[in-house]
Regions:
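C-terminal substrate-binding/catalytic lobe of Rossmann-fold NAD(P)-dependent oxidoreductases
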Residues: 2, 10-39, 122-233
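Short, acidic/turn-prone active-site loops that include or flank metal/cofactor-
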Residues: 32-34, 72-76, 99
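Short acidic/histidine-rich motifs immediately flanking catalytic phosphotransfer sites
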Residues: 39-46, 62-67
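Rossmann-fold NAD(P) dinucleotide-binding segment
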Residues: 51-71, 80-82
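Rossmann-fold dehydrogenase core element
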Residues: 67, 82-100, 117, 121
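Rossmann-fold NAD(P)-binding glycine/threonine-rich loop
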Residues: 72-93, 104, 109-112
Length: 233
C-alpha cells in the first residue's frame, strides 16, 4: 500500500517507521499543503498536521477521491462539512481523536461507567483531567472531548467546559507538562468516596500503529468512519 503522510512531525515520523515495518511504501512526507504532484499518487493519506491546516488538507484529498485517515484534533467544528464533502465525492474519511487500542477500550469503559453513574449524578460530581506535553497546541485534547461527549450522552450533563465546573457543565482540566505523551483521568467524587478510571500512554507508538491499521482497513471502503468500526468495538 502506498501512503502519503500529510504532517510530518513526531507522530508522522513514528507512523513512517511502523508503516514500513508492515510492508507499506511511504510515497510522500509533507509539512506543506498537499497537491496532486507532491502527494505522489497514494492509496491513502494519513493526516497528522495542525488544527489550522487539517480542514484544507482533508478537503483537498477527499475532492481527489483519496481516502483520508485523520488524527489531527482542534478543528472539529468543521468536521460535519468534511463528512458532507466525503459523501459528495464518494470518498472515504476516518477520524480518530485517538487511535490507540487501549484508549478505545478506555472509551468503552468510560461510557459504561457513565451509564452506571447516571442514577447517582446528584450524589457524585464528575470531572475530567488530561495531561499532555507542552508542544500540544489544542486544549482540551480531542481524546478528552470524546470522553466528555460520551459522558454527556449518558448523564444529566448538558455540555463540557474547560476547567472545573459545577452543575450541568462537565469540567475538563487540561495540563501541559514536559514531554507527557498523554494521560486521561475521569473522576466521580462524592462526600464519602471517589471513583476514578485512568489511561496513561507511555509513548506514541500505540497511536501510530492504530493509525496505520486504520489506513489498511479503509482501503476499498466509502463513507465516514470511526476507530470503533476499525477495532470492532
Amino acid at each position: 500500500m502506498k501512503i502519503a503522510l500529510v504532517g510530518y512531525g513526531k507522530m508522522g515520523h513514528i507512523i513512517d517507521k511502523i508503516a514500513q515495518t508492515r510492508g507499506h511504501e511511504i510515497v510522500a512526507r509533507l509539512n506543506e499543503s498537499p497537491t496532486l504532484e507532491n502527494l505522489n499518487n497514494p492509496d491513502v493519506v494519513i493526516e497528522f498536521s495542525s488544527p489550522e491546516s487539517a480542514f484544507g488538507n482533508i478537503k483537498f484529498c477527499l475532492e481527489q477521491g483519496i481516502p483520508v485517515v485523520c488524527g489531527t484534533t482542534g478543528w472539529l467544528e468543521k468536521k460535519p462539512e468534511i463528512e458532507k464533502i466525503c459523501i459528495e465525492n464518494n470518498a472515504a474519511f476516518l477520524y480518530g481523536s485517538n487511535f490507540s487500542l487501549g484508549v478505545n477500550l478506555f472509551f468503552a469503559l468510560n461510557e459504561k461507567l457513565a451509564q452506571l453513574m447516571k442514577p447517582f449524578n446528584n450524589d457524585y460530581d464528575c470531572q475530567l483531567e488530561e495531561i499532555h506535553h507542552i508542544h500540544k497546541l489544542d486544549k482540551p485534547s480531542g481524546t478528552a472531548i470524546s470522553l466528555a461527549q460520551d459522558i454527556i450522552s449518558n448523564s444529566n450533563f448538558e455540555k463540557w467546559k474547560l476547567d472545573e465546573t459545577l452543575g450541568k457543565e462537565l469540567g475538563i482540566r487540561a495540563i501541559r507538562e514536559e514531554e507527557v505523551p498523554g494521560t486521561h483521568i475521569v473522576t466521580y467524587r462524592s462526600e464519602v468516596d471517589e471513583i476514578e478510571i485512568k489511561h496513561t500512554a507511555f509513548n506514541r507508538n500505540g497511536f501510530a500503529l492504530g493509525a496505520v491499521i486504520a489506513s489498511e482497513w479503509i482501503i476499498g471502503r466509502k463513507g465516514n468512519f470511526t476507530v470503533k468500526e476499525v477495532l470492532g468495538l
